[in-house]
Design a protein with these regions (language model features):
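GIY-YIG nuclease catalytic motif and its immediate N-terminal context
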Residues: 1-42
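C-terminal terminal-subdomain/extension
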Residues: 1-5, 76-143
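Compact nucleic-acid interaction/catalytic patches
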Residues: 37-89
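A generic secondary-structure signal marking the coil-to-beta-strand transition
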Residues: 19-21, 61, 96
């Protein structure tokens, strides 16, 4: 078993990257995926929401994510998630908005590295009511 295969088995065992898990994704990765992404100088990470519905089979497979933003999004297919930042943060009570218009495939190899993708320890997963809204969004139903 080579080192990449061992790393994959370790990541697959330790990390829950299933639908509804919340992450902090380095802006460099978002910029690589979205040409119009604006990287603010005082912010290195943006929230990510996994919409992965299947098991990842290898280290170079991808986990589909939705990009979160503090800019209010309007529309019928928008999820608002609160309390993603620590309580001491000025962003704690501000919602992050997710839209299904921009899913982004991120390689499993990036997960668990503090300079690329880290799990949101403040809020690792959507709450049940938020999960219901996400399911409606992904099925194309009005939220």
């Amino acid at each position: 078993m080579d080192s990449e295969e061992r790393r994959f088995k370790l990541l697959d065992t330790l990390l829950d990257y299933s639908k509804g898990t919340l992450w902090w994704v380095h802006n460099r990765l978002w910029k690589e995926q979205f040409a119009g992404f604006v990287w603010k100088k005082n912010s290195d990470f943006h929230p990510g929401l996994s919409i992965c519905r299947r098991d990842v089979e290898g280290i170079y497979n991808t986990v589909p994510m939705l990009l979160g933003t503090s800019k209010r999004l309007h529309g019928r297919h928008v999820l608002s998630v609160r309390h993603m930042s620590p309580e001491w943060s000025s962003h704690h009570d501000r919602p992050s908005y997710f839209s299904v218009l921009r899913p982004c495939p991120l390689r499993l190899d990036y997960f668990g590295r503090k300079d690329t993708i880290t799990q949101n320890v403040t809020k690792p997963r959507l709450e049940s009511d938020e999960m219901r809204v996400l399911d409606k969004m992904l099925s194309g139903k009005e939220v």
